[in-house]
Amino acid sequence: MIYKKQYGHPFDTESVVGSFVSAMETIPYLTREPDGFSYAMDPQDILYGLGENIRGINKRGWVYESKCSDDPNHTENKSSLYGAYNFMIVSGKATFGFFIDYPGKVTFDCGYTDLDTLRVTVAEENYDLYIIEGESPTDIVHQFRQLVGRSYIPPKWAFGATQSRWSYMNEDEVREVVANYRTNNMPLDAVVLDIDYMERYKDFTVDEQRFPHFADFAAEMKAQGIRLVPIIDAGVKIEDGYDVYEEGVKNGYFCTNQDGTPFVAGVWPGRVHFPDMLNPEARAWFGSKYKFLLNQGIEGFWNDMNEPAIFYSEETLKKTFAKIDEYRTQNLDISSFFAFKNLVAWLSNNENDYKLFYHNTKQGRMRHDKVHNIFGYNMTRAAGEAFEQLEPDKRILMYSRSACIGMHRYGGIWTGDNQSWWSHILLSLHMMPSLNMCGFLYEGPDIGGFGSNTTEDLVLRWYGVGIFSPLLRNHSAAGTRKQEPYRFKNKAAFAGILQLRYLLLPYIYSEYMKAALRDGMYCMPLAFAFPDDDFARQVEDEVMIGESLLIAPVYEQNARGRYVYLPEEMLQVRVKCSENDRMETTVLPAGHHYIPVELDEVVFFVRKGHILPIAKGGDSIQNVASVNFADLRLFAHAPDGAAYEYYTDDGETKDYDKPEHFVHITLDADGNAKSDCADVKVEKA
């Protein structure tokens, strides 16, 4: 049951699409506070949610902010990252969920100030509060997802491997990447183009020196099974003669200063204007610009810098230079030196800059900081709504850096500029179920780490987690060690682990689609799948992938194994990646086990009475198109038989809900496998 309480005059974020709610006079569970509300926590209560954020799956013990921020240092002392996900579940003495529909800053003090008190502070008393009651956390998630709408569904090729770097500078560098993948028997479906493919960092342009025949090049890549995925940034370069800039100024499509003139900020191109993504006309105009690249054969995009990131504003830059001049003749002591040192560092993402510009919305003129968290959401919405008009029957890949609940209907996310740190492998695992709760099923980290220099063992172990993420993307920053998998010594292991991803695709795609179509979770904490298991409630480094699969990755350097907790008897599957994905199976009882896992191995576990369908192998897997989704091997520990509902479609069109896409597979106690569709062939592994 969902209840709603309105405070003040909320801005309509359009995050909520469901209407099956009941108004409430007084809010249950929560105690009203002058600037929000609080909840007295029991010692055993667990707090789930908040999407992409730092720390663990259980958010208890820290303070978090919903404040979209361009911050590449994802350390434990931070309180916010790129997105705003105001959905949380309390699980314990009482189990309920709540969602705060508000586009500005919200603070979640999850027992930081007072160990036993959850205190939520909303910047203004203009918001909608939803309380969700259910039989379990999974039921609460299901109801919430019905409230906010169906999750984005990408094309099937978007579940293949993606290679990215800031930047592949020209056509030949991209060709070299693809050739090296193919030579080393590593499957690949997409290559990402970062900001240097553009003409001087201008959106919806192509540098004709570096990519002189862009449409032909996109066709050349597609003929090899490779899609190009170019970046689009939020800032539009100020330059006479640049059509996007001139149209935006002429029609009043940019965010403005208080006096109505276009607001100027600094990002990659230097001085830019921000399209007013909250103005419906401006949003439609910006979305229409994606046609420039669609017409050249592009079928996927990533939106970046859309918090929006601000390197500087003209006003803050002017004040900074004045302050530097003031310090020029001073004796810089312990106080003034550090103040001087931080002057330039404080330029970027300065909170004051977000109070300088305005939006023209359906509800009138709004200062940006009051609606800050829905800017990136509406940039991706601009693209999604345009795709519906420009390619109504075709799935287009879209993922974004900044996000807010509601954006999950239009695209996925990658989890931003992480580092090549072992702790970030675990952090990426923690983010998966938290994002799934909020509707963001299509997600993934920068495998290998974006910042810092990576190591071969780190990349291998990260792939051991990443092959289970819907978005499988290796990405790194300029100036760091190149980390394409073919650059390392153990090429056979990298080839095998990527091949394993493609063998698992029938299951991964099936579980993703069922979760999206039925408002469920593709990835969930163990506690959601085993609600009566007290120990499972405490496990933070294992998760369920779909209904059948438990993963427990190795995330510490030099570890050659780890302890794993199995809530029930399961089938262990050990994959020897450097030996053409040779698989060994062992039945393990419930309980704690030390599991050896060598660098070239991946180990996962199949639930008793469940089926894991995988594709048949071979040397021909180069991309998603070469995976046979209709010729399956079934892994199972099913002494009493088992059944599985398998989803398969063409992966391109949008007729998701047709009954014929759902195939029923059974396995009897003697190992005899059947499917109710003649086109899907199955056999026990």
Feature map (PLM): residue ranges:
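Extracellular structured ligand-interaction cores
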Residues: Y82-N86, K93-T95, P103, N126, ...
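N-terminal small/glycine-rich loop or linker at the start of catalytic domains
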Residues: R150-S164, T261-F274
